[in-house]
Amino acid sequence: MKHTLLIKDWLSSFLSLLFPRCCVVCGRPLAKGEECICTVCNINLPRTNYHLRKDNPVERLFWGQIPLERATSFFFYEKGSDFRLILHRLKYGGQKEIGAIMGRYMAAELLSSHFFQGIDVIIPIPLHKKKQQIRGYNQSEWIARGVSAVTGIPIDTE
């Protein structure tokens, strides 16, 4: 068992020398433990902190539409921002795994605020059937998968 792990670590290190994993934002090589976005770029992403406010702008969008316990947007979508670049790679670049990674980042940060307390299910925003056919996946569902992986809250796509 130890030999197998050592071989995997060695092979992974060797492949990283030949094909370094790079940050999708700045292009610098990722450190061990970083996933698709380096720590510096992750820290600099424009967070809304809406999860800290009851009655935030995202929740207000749903008032009178559907029964809702909580809603938030974790990042601002600003012209020219690094988050916009990440989102475009997720939506139009076929990099659906970025959604799961971003969902895990988001859930890990929101856990300490008790944002998920009392939440029974995660419902990703549905994507129009034509867009889903073209893209091959729903980016919201991939973000929800990342959130679910950290929180253990099930996803309902029906």
Give the label of every model feature segment.
Residues 1-158:
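Glycine-rich phosphate/pyrophosphate-handling loop used in enzymes and phosphotransfer proteins
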